[in-house]
Swiss-Prot record:
Lineage of producing organism: Eukaryota, Viridiplantae, Streptophyta, Embryophyta, Tracheophyta
Keywords in alphabetical order: ATP-binding, Membrane, Nucleotide-binding, Transmembrane, Transmembrane helix, Transport, Vacuole
Family: Belongs to the ABC transporter superfamily. ABCG family. Eye pigment precursor importer (TC 3.A.1.204) subfamily.
Annotated GO MF terms: ABC-type transporter activity; ATP binding; ATP hydrolysis activity
Coarse class of the protein's main subcellular location: membrane
Mode of membrane association: Multi-pass membrane protein
Cited function: Confers selective resistance to kanamycin.
PANTHER family membership: ABC TRANSPORTER G FAMILY MEMBER 19, ABC TRANSPORTER G FAMILY MEMBER 28
Domain ABC transporter: 73-325
Ranges where the ABC transmembrane type-2 domain occurs: 419-629
Protein location: Vacuole membrane
Record-given protein name: ABC transporter G family member 19
Record field: transmembrane: 438-458, 473-493, 515-535, 537-557, 577-597, 606-626, 698-718
Length: 725
């Protein structure tokens, strides 16, 4: 694009939605540029005159150069203390650690406020405090936007975004797909899909991701975008709705100098479009410092400098430690702070000097004459400023340019719950389909397990031994279905952090996520269930025919569903892979012990009976037993077979016949070699299974999966607030 200023005209050549445009302070928003450029591409110059050359147009700057709506974020006297918990009973009393100590500052639209400091200085803590990620009551002080308190405000979540330090993205989605799904979540449903796509395309160019637009994000096992591109995608997700305030926790961490500079360049363009950008950064290069507008340097929670980078040399010169020429001013400042922290007096002298320096600066500002125009601009209320921003194209979630309603009616979420559920399910399925190794691994696991069982339990007969082997088969099959679901642990742990990032600022509802996650998991379990059932049912020789096979398939499917729900719930409560594995395996082991196989229900101590009835393995185990043995025509002990597995088992067949005749005379009941002495119903009674039908057990198994999904919802709702305490 060729830009040349002549009076108030700009010559634009080959304008397109994909053109990168670095806007000056006071420039139009990206949405406005798209609309204006689109009209010029159609040949309308803006004054009703059609141009003959579609590749060259004259744009009136007055139509584009809109004065930005002023926003000022003030934070005063922020104090944040945490109580150090005792690790052991014999340790000393609880102590208190101060993470933020009387920190104040200001951030304006069009500017980047960078928080600097060594590790542990309080950078991330300050960003979290300003973003409302500190639990209510833990933070003292005030945070206001245009004079109105926004700390712990619902409105702050709607108009702001928070970019975490870790780039947590779905690995098998492309850059464009990732941003498009973000637009579906954060932009109102009233906005057409074509408009959302325009926003995504323009954002791709703004982020410098055009060459990587169709490349998958990637992970350890899949080649994808570079680290710098990945970081820019993370930023793009959170600025898709054009937030008024953007918080970033060390966005340049882990990047080389070139990629770090490119990221801050992107942030500069975002700020110049009318947003407040506040970020923490560890040690910026000289090039990055030139892009920053304001600096706050922290030392152990205290502010040792607050001002523009240009005033930093004068500040330290007045302090008596002038910055040498050609020295990186930020590196010098941070090195000096570290030096003072290691001294006996610490940074107290620098903190006191900063307070006096700030007071002198405030006095100079107050004594300087200000125009009424500036005072009028800065006196806009927050609601007026937000409505004005929406009117001029700021894409605030829950609002639209055509209907900039008052902020009381702005929804916390951009879309209804049903739409969120559909988009979440669509995204999950697209990512899952592109990872066939996960599907293949589970199917391969159940195939190998099924084949192993088929060879070990091939064509069981109807003898006492066959009955016992059926019991051991089912005692192995049912818990195996649950243990196979443990492969969900690492997948969901990763998704959990994506969920936290996206719901921190109301991308979608927790209920929408849980419902979509549950619905998508159902078809994933179908193939493993059918494969395992088909292999084991016919080869082992289970009873029931086609009807029995269908029920067996449903039961295996229900067991997979229940096991998946249990593992998902535990993953939501225990966000650590190794601990989650340990808790899941231990819980399933307890359920197996008290399911009724190892210890008969009548033998379970009365104080553990309650666990027997809530064991998730009890009901599928009983269901499969009923499906196999609840047939009065099937006999498992006939005539002389009654002596098998006893001391008389070694007697000859003729001897057993004589013993049977003697027993028949004693009991005065005719017992022959073909007389059925134990049916399947007798085996069920021996196992203590007489209370429920097999269909009751099946529905209870399905219901247990639903119950754990509900628990999973509450675990995310109350246990994943992602706030400091």
């Amino acid at each position: 694009m060729n830009l040349s200023l002549s009076g108030r005209k700009i010559a634009m050549t080959r304008v397109s939605a994909e053109t990168q445009y670095i806007t000056p302070i006071g420039s139009p928003t990206l949405d406005e540029l798209l609309k204006d450029c689109d009209s010029f591409r159609k040949g309308d110059s803006g004054d009703g005159v059609k141009s003959d050359d579609p590749a060259h147009h004259i744009i009136d700057v007055e139509a584009l150069y809109v004065k930005p709506v002023p926003y000022v974020l003030n934070f005063n006297n922020l104090q944040y203390d945490v109580t150090l918990r005792r690790r052991f009973g014999f340790s000393r009393q609880n102590g208190v650690k101060t993470l933020l100590d009387d920190v104040s500052g200001e951030a304006s639209d069009g500017d980047i406020l960078a928080v600097l400091g060594a590790s542990g200085a309080g950078k991330s803590t300050l960003i979290d405090a300003l973003a409302g990620r500190v639990a209510e009551g833990s933070l003292r002080g005030s945070v206001t936007l245009n004079g109105e308190k926004v700390l712990q405000s619902r409105l702050l979540k709607v108009i702001s975004a928070y970019v975490m330090q870790d780039d947590l993205l779905f690995p098998m989605l492309t850059v464009k797909e990732t941003l498009m799904f973000a637009s579906e979540f954060r932009l109102p449903r009233s906005l057409s899909k074509s408009k959302k796509m325009e926003r995504v395309e323009a954002l791709i160019d703004q982020l410098g991701l055009r060459n990587a637009a169709n490349t998958v994000i990637g992970d350890e096992g899949h080649r994808g975008v570079s680290g710098g591109e990945r970081r820019r995608v993370s930023i793009g997700i959170d600025i898709i709705h054009d937030p008024i305030v953007l918080f970033l926790d060390e966005p340049t961490s882990g990047l080389d100098s070139t990629n770090a500079f490119m990221v801050v360049q992107v942030l500069k363009r975002i700020a110049q479009s009318g947003s407040i950008v506040i970020m923490s950064i560890h040690q910026p290069s000289a090039r990055i410092v030139e892009l920053l507008d304001r600096l706050i340097i922290l030392s152990r929670g205290k502010s040792v400098f607050n001002g523009s980078p240009a005033s930093l040399p004068g500040f330290f010169s007045d302090f008596g430690r002038p910055i040498p020429e050609k020295e990186n001013i930020s590196e010098f400042a941070l090195d000096l702070v570290r030096e003072l922290e290691g001294s006996n007096e610490g940074t107290k002298a620098l903190v006191d000097f900063n307070e006096k320096w700030q007071q002198n600066k405030i006095s100079l500002i107050q004594s300087a004459p200000q125009t009424n125009k500036l005072d009028q601009d800065r006196s806009l209320s927050l609601k007026e400023a937000i409505n004005a921003s929406v009117s001029r194209g700021k894409l605030v979630s829950g609002s639209s340019r055509s209907n900039p309603t008052s902020m009381e009616t702005v929804s916390s979420y951009a879309n209804p719950s049903l739409f969120e559920t559909f988009i979440l399910a669509k995204r999950y399925m697209k990512n899952w389909i592109r990872m066939p190794e996960l599907v293949g691994t589970r199917i391969a696991t159940v195939m190998v397990t099924g084949c192993l069982l088929a060879t070990v339990y091939w064509k069981l007969d109807h003898t006492p031994r066959g009955a016992q082997e059926r019991l051991t088969l089912f005692a192995f099959v049912v818990p195996t279905m649950f243990y196979c679901c443990l492969d969900n642990v690492p997948v969901f742990i990763q998704e959990r952090y994506i969920f936290l990032r996206e719901t921190t600022h109301n991308a979608y509802r927790t209920s929408s996520y849980v419902i979509s996650h549950s619905l998508v998991s159902l078809p994933q379990l179908l193939a493993p269930s059918l494969v395992f059932s088909a292999i084991t049912f016919w080869t082992v020789g289970l009873s029931g025919g086609l009807e029995g096979f269908v029920f067996y398939c449903l039961l295996i499917y229900a067991s997979f569903w229940s096991g998946s729900s249990v593992v998902t719930f535990i993953s939501g409560v225990v966000p650590n892979i190794m601990l989650c594995y340990m808790v899941s395996i231990t819980y399933l082991a307890y359920c197996l012990l008290l399911s009724g196989f190892y210890v008969n229900r009548d033998r379970i101590p009365f104080y553990w009976t309650w666990f027997h009835y809530i064991s998730i393995l009890k009901y599928p185990y009983e269901a499969v037993l009923i499906n196999e043995f609840d047939d009065p025509s099937r006999c498992f002990v006939r005539g002389v077979q009654v002596f098998d597995s006893t001391l008389l088992g070694g007697v000859s067949d003729s001897g057993k016949v004589k013993l049977l005749e003697t027993l028949s005379k004693s009991l005065r009941t005719k017992i022959t070699e073909s007389t059925c002495l134990r049916t399947g119903s007798d085996l069920l009674a021996q196992q203590g299974i007489t209370q429920l039908s097999k269909w009751d057990c099946l529905w209870i198994t399905f219901a247990s999966g639903l119950f754990f999904r509900i628990l999973f919802y509450f675990a995310l709702l109350f246990g994943s607030r992602n706030k400091r305490t």
